[in-house]
């Protein structure tokens, strides 16, 4: 296994420079992160661990989430993930596979079975190890990390290890180690230098059975099972129709999310379908593609860089002040799209392929999701006079457009509408004054 270090970080920086050079030839989109935005901290034939670049490094527009990081862990079948702890709070979601995870904290050891759809909170400083017990399926986990020491930076610490990964015990002086363990130096050296196989290693069926038998509590005092995972996919969907399903977990569902002010959701959008345009009142959503292909479209205030007027500058009377631009990104497995609060956004699944999207919501406690099309379109709440004054059209015409979409949350996508016979419908272009976003 390759250990993260100077050479890999230099390779990552070189890759970023290449990506920046390529980016000069296309419109800048600070909200999209592709495969090249990840840095591999470790990888081998048995698994890999990669971390998305810091959000604030990409753009000052994302400085509000600079103290959050995303990462992905993949473990091949029948493998053991070495014990370690983070200087960060963690929430993870199991995207694929099943296994056993064990937590060590204070005088307790607790183990839990994990499977696809599970959400779990790992407190900072808790030692964690895991196994992928499947014979032919990867264990694929997405992680949201909230560093507690240096904003935007976190580290992994290995104690029960050797030379690869390096045990932090090796960094203490010989005298300190001999006194701490009451053991001669030569025995300590043999112990802390023996493991050289890497952070994820292959194990036997017998070892899997032994490690799987630890489910429950042991090794000390028993306490409430507060760290149990919560399965998002086993609850009733918040919304479902032939065009998609939405599953959401808030702190009221899984109380371990409450102090982090985070929520977790999964949207499974059927092929050639879309989520209705919507915005979040206060949460920033970190959307990661679990499976499938499609694209995101988001409306952003238009920024003119150095030519931007100062905030106290006034516009001539009657001149348009607010302008928007659309950022569009093709997405596939592992792609990340950041959705700031207030920004209208939609996701569209490709033809012949569903689009499954995982969202971590930050500052989610009092968030409200406002849909902008469909039966639950918030604009339907405008009174008659407000509709007429706002759109400059008769209220009946406005309402006719709003009522034309009978579905909510998940809708037929652009491709599906083109492929179906269209009934006579009111003109959206005439109402909004343009042909599209």
Language model regions located:
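Conserved metal-binding segment of the jelly-roll/cupin
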Residues: 77-78, 114-134, 269-272, 328-352, ...
